[in-house]
Every structure is written in structure tokens, then in C-alpha cells.
Amino acid sequence: MTHSVVELIEIESAIIQVKMQDRTHKNAFSQELTDDLIQAFEYIRQNPKYKAVILTGYDNYFASGGTQEGLLRIQQGLTKFTDDNLYSLALDCEIPVIAAMQGHGIGGGFVMGLFADIVILSRESVYTANFMKYGFTPGMGATFIVPKKLGFSLAQEILLNAGSYRGADLEKRGVPFKVLPRAEVLDYAVELAQELAEKPRNSLVTLKDHLVAPLRDQLPRVIEQELMMHEKTFHHEEVKSRIKGLYGN
């Protein structure tokens, strides 16, 4: 099943792969990719035969965060990152989601992957929460999920400094994720999904509900706080010029 920029691949009867492939925007969150992702997870929600989801990108890209146009619209006060609830698609999905981040994860794209239940990184790929590079504070739940998944000290560095890290660098820093050569990421994700699919669906759903309940409970308050910080930090001329001058560099 293929939407224009998201392909749904049924690997086995109980395992579905959500492949993001907006090559025009290098998997940045274009309106097309956003809409197709939301539709893909709605399709999964309506199909109770599935027990595991593998979320992945194409070639060297996992997901690249906001488009330049999208960031400028937020800067101008026309939209908010909450208008399209991409960040919690994996968290809200009933069944386990594996983020097979075979390619670069940039900004909100990296954050979206971290909301998955299981995360796999690629040694060669670059991962960054680069919000502060443009001069605005992080959104999409980054200030919540990055510390939760990577640990507070590393998260502070990643969020404040907005630096770029190869998967191999993060492996040396002790991230709790499997870090593999890019060519092996998807195969490993499929192996994990097959192991998940051996379990009863009801038990998978029940346990995920229990494990992520604190995250689901706390996230809305954090999103409110991030929006308040955006009101303080986003609507400045310096941010506008940074988005125009630094985007894609």
C-alpha cells in the first residue's frame, strides 16, 4: 500500500513497515509526508492483525524535521508544531513501534524516532536535535523524550549545543540503543519485529500501555511548556535570518 511519500510494506502478516520516502524534501516534514504518516498510523490502528511496526526512511535519510517553509511559518506565528501531531504517533500507537533509523535523524525527525518503543541507530548516520542552531528552543517534545531516552547529561549537551553526532559517536557516549552499520539496521529491526510478533497481541498492547503510561501522562504538560518557550524565543528577526541562512547547512 503506497501513499505518495509513505509506503506501507507488510513484511509478514503481523509486521508492517512504514517507509518514509519524500525524496524531494529529504524526508523533512512536508505537508505531504505529514499527512501520509498520520494516515499510515490510522490505517495500522484500524487493522488489528498487526503486532509490530517498523518505522524507517530511505537511503541515507530517516527523517529531517521541519521544512524551511514550515519553520518560517512557525516563526511568523502562522502555525505551531502542535498543529500536526507527528511527534507522538509512535507513542500513541497501540502496538510496539521500532524506529529503524538507518539514515540521518535531524531535529524533529530525530525526536520523532526517539518516541518509538525500540530505537536502532546507524553508525554512519548523523543525529542532531538542532533547534538551537536556528536560535529557538526545542519543540516536538524534545525536552522530554531526549533526556528520557538518552539520559539527562547527554541530553543537556545535545539540546543546548545543537551539535551533530554520528551514530558511532553516540555509541561511544553510551546510548542505550543498538548501533549498527546502515546496511544491517533494517534486517535487525525485522528480527526484533518477528520476536515481538510471536507474542499475543493483547499482551503486547497491555504491556506497552503500562510501560508508556507515564510518558503519555506527562507529555501534554511538556508540550505546553515548549509552546510557551516558543512564544519567547521563536518570533525574533535573528531566528528568521538563521532559518533562511543556515537551513540545510
Swiss-Prot record:
Compartments (UniProt record): Cytoplasm
Active site positions, chain numbering: H230
Effect of H230A: Reduces the enzymatic activity
Function (record text): Involved in some intermediate steps for the synthesis of the antibiotic polyketide bacillaene which is involved in secondary metabolism. Catalyzes the decarboxylation of the 3-methylglutaconyl group tethered to PksL to a 3-methylcrotonyl moiety.
Subunit: Homotrimer. Does not form a heterotrimeric complex with PksH.
NCBIfam families with a match to the protein in the record: PRK07110.1
Annotated protein name in UniProt: Bacillaene synthase decarboxylase PksI
Source species of the chain: Bacillus subtilis (strain 168)
Taxonomic placement: Bacteria, Bacillati, Bacillota, Bacilli, Bacillales
